[in-house]
């Protein structure tokens, strides 16, 4: 199969992965309306072409939280990344490090903090949920700090897990799930050998380190289901500040009032996000939510955005709508599943090239030049 775009990596991942894993990363909540709108709303934003501007000195470099990024992209936290390639978190982190951008390790990663951090040169970011087990949260924060993690990404849009119906159909959950996953793996020998056998242990490294025992996929579903905390409030973030003195980014903001609260709390950044359409179906796409949030808090904290970003043009669109940096989730996991760490490196290089084309033809010589002037007026007003 010839890979020439991010969509090609998705197709290659679908061929290589057992269905339960492909649909886990590919699917969303309920009828997946928001999942679809995330991609569609971005693709419908028209860029404003400008020419004859001498774009020979174009630069993608930017700064965020005192870090220099080669382009305004970071890899998002994605649970179970280590099930998509052998020691997948390590491979993805190394690809991000090579490109000069941050990698964010999920709370529910296969590879623990202590395995990923030493594999890269730049400090990684760490993502944390609010869970009932505050002992685990404190333990994770202390370990992240000890490993040199520079930025905490605190996910707040998951007080309860979303209803992901695709998971029940695919075998990730539902009746006879373990047997269905086993049978699917038999018909995907490359994955079964490379990841299923050689990628062991398949436990949740960060949780296993705390519990002192292996935690497999069934434990993952059960432990998370019993530990999400619907009582989450701003007081929980104050508690976290007692154990984390570095930059804190609040992930899961879709409303300007919540963004203003994040400023009052003293957050260093927010992620405008609907969890990739995996939590509450029917909410606005991140692209539609972003402009009002940027109007409310731009300049008061860093604005990151995710959900629906599949290529370099989408990155430019999000920046034009008000984001300082974007997080890339599904897209890098597709590339990882299809071609390992090299696939992630190739995808990041492709996004780099796509951004350069878009910036050249919109007249933006630097990241700071990307704003609403890069968008067609009618579309800009329509958002």
Swiss-Prot record:
Cellular localisation: Cell inner membrane
E.C. number: 1.1.-.-
EC top class, as a word: oxidoreductase
Domain of life: Bacteria
Active site (UniProt): 275
Gene Ontology MF term list: FMN binding; L-lactate dehydrogenase activity
Summary of the function given for this chain in its UniProt record: Catalyzes the conversion of L-lactate to pyruvate. Is coupled to the respiratory chain.
Name the UniProt record assigns to this protein: L-lactate dehydrogenase
Organism: Acinetobacter baumannii (strain SDF)
Gene: lldD
């Amino acid at each position: 199969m010839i890979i020439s775009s991010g969509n090609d990596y998705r197709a290659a991942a679908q061929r290589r992965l057992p269905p339960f894993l492909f649909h886990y990363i590919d699917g969303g909540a309920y009828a997946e309306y928001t999942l679809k709108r995330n991609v569609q709303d971005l693709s419908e934003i028209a860029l404003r072409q400008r020419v004859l501007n001498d774009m020979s000195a174009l630069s993608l470099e930017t700064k965020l939280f005192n870090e220099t990024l080669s382009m305004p992209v970071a890899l998002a936290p994605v649970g179970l990344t280590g099930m998509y390639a052998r020691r997948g978190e390590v491979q993805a982190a190394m690809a991000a490090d090579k490109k000069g951008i941050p990698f964010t390790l999920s709370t529910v990663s296969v590879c623990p903090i202590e395995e990923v951090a030493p594999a890269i040169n730049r400090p990684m970011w760490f993502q944390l949920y609010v869970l009932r087990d505050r002992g685990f949260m404190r333990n994770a924060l202390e370990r992240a700090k000890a490993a040199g993690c520079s930025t905490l990404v605190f996910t707040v849009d998951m007080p309860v897990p979303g209803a992901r119906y695709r998971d029940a159909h695919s075998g990730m959950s539902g009746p006879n799930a373990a047997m269905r996953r086993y049978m699917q793996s038999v018909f995907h020998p490359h994955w079964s050998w490379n990841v299923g056998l050689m990628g062991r242990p398949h436990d949740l490294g960060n949780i296993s380190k705390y519990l002192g025992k292996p935690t497999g996929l069934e434990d993952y579903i059960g432990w998370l289901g019993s530990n999400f905390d619907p009582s989450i409030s701003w007081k929980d973030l104050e508690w976290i500040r007692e154990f984390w003195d570095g930059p804190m980014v609040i992930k899961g903001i879709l409303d300007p009032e919540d963004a203003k609260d994040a400023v009052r709390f003293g957050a260093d950044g927010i992620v405008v996000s609907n969890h990739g359409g995996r939590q509450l179906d029917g909410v606005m796409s991140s692209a539609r939510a972003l402009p009002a949030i940027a109007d409310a808090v731009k300049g008061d904290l860093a604005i990151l955005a995710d959900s629906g970003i599949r290529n370099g043009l989408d990155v430019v669109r999000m920046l034009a709508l008000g984001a300082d940096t974007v997080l890339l989730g599904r897209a890098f996991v597709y590339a990882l599943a299809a071609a390992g760490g090299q696939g992630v490196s190739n995808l990041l290089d492709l996004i780099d090239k796509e951004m350069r084309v878009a910036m050249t033809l919109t007249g933006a010589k630097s990241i700071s030049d990307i704003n609403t002037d890069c968008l067609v007026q009618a579309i800009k007003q329509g958002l």
